């Protein structure tokens, strides 16, 4: 028994010791509880400050949340006694909150990608709210700097709310195949899976329809409630961001689908400079293959897909978004915004859409389907603990219909915290997609280049810059004061170094040893090495 399950059992023993006035039993239970306050183990707190339980899978909203709330309670309970946590243990819990959970809560709502299998009614609110109590409990016994950051977390997420967020940046959770991007006005996250990391689970009839939730699900938030309680009305084959089969058949069930549950690919990861970043995955699951990547900037998320193919006769789609309807879904045609009612198939000339606070722009001609409609559903259909009661709601959705095309691709932008006017005027020519195929996905944005090399490739990033990427990986190149700043990541977690040439000059990036990574509590650039190279 490990992780939170072990803590729950030890907590029962602790209560027994208290009732029996047995000091030694209480001490033994306490020691068992705090023994789980560590990182780098197979389950529990990971070295990137995510949390695993039931094998290698992210459990922020379930076991990890229970672990943090319970441990914070013990931290406050034991403070000032002989059972008090030591400095290292307190520091681990504080970092778990500040370097882990702080990233996945936006204005009092937990990210859908963090809920795991527990898709309860208003779960985003309740789970985020429990963190407020955990934060207050951790303050007792914490350093002044940690208390300051905890207070900032509370101000960002709980009443009275700020207009924007003071906590911004970009982080890839390398142990859990998940990326979070935060600006002052919006947040986005991507959840993936690999041959290392399980995407999601079905336990106790929780998450009966969540088969695709780890296939590159992308959520964007401005208020935080954009997806609140949408689950009964979802088309579960069109979870935002995923590429999946178009079918009226029931979504595959985890417990009888064998090897199809796991993504077979190792190439899943992300790179960041702390402010922007690129995330990529090879999807190889259920007979469907795709190369998917996301570029996160201060103003938008650029989504790329290539090599989409399957061994099925079913059509394939890529979901751009599917969220709660708040106002009209608008399409841009001949200089005017027109409302979408029901289902609308756009023409190649109509590639801009807007809804609520978010714009969407397709960067290449695609068969895009826009939906704005009322739907009915039942919570019990995906969470077995609910009564069989029908509820109604309204959703809007956008998806790209690839049909049965072999080697399909896509390019589209998501513009959070935008307006219809800004979406219409957005200058797409400022983004240069250099290549988008199964070998490489490369994009130029200003003086920065984002590159995912799935295999060794030579690419001309600009007229006077040729890069020979000898080791597959995810790279960022940025010109800074006449030098090239390089950020790089190994998505396979198998390389000790990355080799490349810039204009025929050799560059080698060496990663720190994995053992040192976990023991040193290094920040979230652990899989990333940076280097200045003179132009």
Segments and roles (model prediction):
Residues 67, 74-497, 502-507:
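Extended polysaccharide-engagement surfaces of secreted carbohydrate-active enzymes
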Residues 407, 512-535:
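Solvent-exposed, conformationally flexible loop/turn segments
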Residues 1-111:
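Aromatic-lined, polymer-binding surfaces characteristic
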């Amino acid at each position: 028994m490990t992780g939170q399950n072990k803590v729950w059992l030890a907590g029962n023993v602790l209560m027994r010791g208290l009732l029996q006035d047995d000091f030694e039993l209480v001490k033994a239970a306490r020691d068992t509880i705090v023994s789980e306050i560590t990182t780098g183990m197979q389950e529990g707190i990971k070295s990137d400050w995510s949390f695993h339980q039931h094998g290698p899978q992210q459990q922020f909203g379930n076991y990890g949340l229970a672990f943090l709330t319970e441990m914070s309670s013990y931290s406050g309970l034991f403070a000032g006694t002989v059972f008090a946590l030591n400095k290292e243990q307190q520091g681990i819990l504080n970092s778990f909150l500040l370097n882990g959970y702080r990233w996945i809560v936006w204005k009092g709502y937990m990210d859908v990608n963090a809920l795991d299998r527990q898709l309860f009614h208003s779960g985003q609110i309740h789970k985020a709210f429990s963190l407020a109590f955990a934060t207050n409990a951790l303050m007792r016994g914490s350093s002044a700097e940690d208390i300051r950051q905890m207070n900032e977390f509370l101000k960002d997420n709980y009443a009275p709310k700020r207009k924007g967020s003071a906590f911004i940046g970009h982080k890839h959770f390398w142990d859990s195949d998940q990326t979070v991007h935060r600006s002052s006005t919006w947040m986005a996250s991507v959840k993936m899976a690999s041959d290392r990391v399980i995407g999601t689970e079905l336990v106790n009839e929780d998450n009966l329809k969540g088969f695709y939730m780890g296939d590159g699900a992308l959520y964007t938030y401005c208020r935080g409630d954009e997806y609140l309680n949408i689950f009964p009305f979802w088309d579960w084959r069109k979870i935002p961001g995923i590429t999946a089969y178009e079918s009226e058949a029931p979504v595959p069930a985890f417990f009888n689908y064998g090897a199809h549950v796991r993504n077979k690919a190792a190439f899943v990861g992300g790179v960041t400079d702390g402010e922007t970043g690129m995330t990529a995955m090879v999807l190889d699951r259920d007979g469907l293959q795709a190369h998917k990547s996301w570029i996160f900037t201060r103003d938008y998320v650029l989504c790329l897909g290539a090599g989409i193919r399957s061994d099925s006769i079913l059509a394939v789609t890529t979901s751009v978004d599917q969220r709660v309807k708040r106002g009209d879904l608008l399409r841009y045609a001949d200089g005017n915004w027109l409302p979408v009612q029901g289902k609308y198939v756009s023409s190649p000339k109509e590639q801009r859409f807007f809804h609520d606070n978010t714009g969407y722009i397709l960067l290449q001609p695609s068969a895009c389907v826009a939906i704005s409609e009322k739907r009915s559903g039942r919570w019990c259909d995906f969470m077995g603990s609910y009564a069989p009661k029908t509820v109604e709601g309204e959703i809007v959705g956008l998806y790209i219909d690839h049909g049965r095309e072999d080697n399909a691709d896509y390019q589209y932008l998501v513009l959070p915290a935008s307006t219809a006017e800004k979406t219409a005027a957005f200058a797409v020519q400022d983004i240069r997609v250099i290549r988008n195929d199964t070998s490489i996905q490369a994009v130029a944005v200003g003086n920065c280049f984002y590159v995912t090399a799935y295999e060794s490739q030579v690419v001309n990033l600009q007229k006077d810059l040729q890069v020979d990427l000898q080791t597959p990986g995810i790279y960022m190149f940025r010109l800074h004061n006449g030098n090239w700043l390089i950020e790089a990541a190994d998505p396979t977690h198998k390389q000790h170094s990355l080799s490349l040439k810039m204009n025929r000059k050799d560059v080698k990036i060496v990663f720190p040893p994995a053992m040192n990574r976990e023991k040193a509590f290094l920040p979230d650039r652990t899989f990333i090495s940076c280097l200045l190279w003179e132009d």
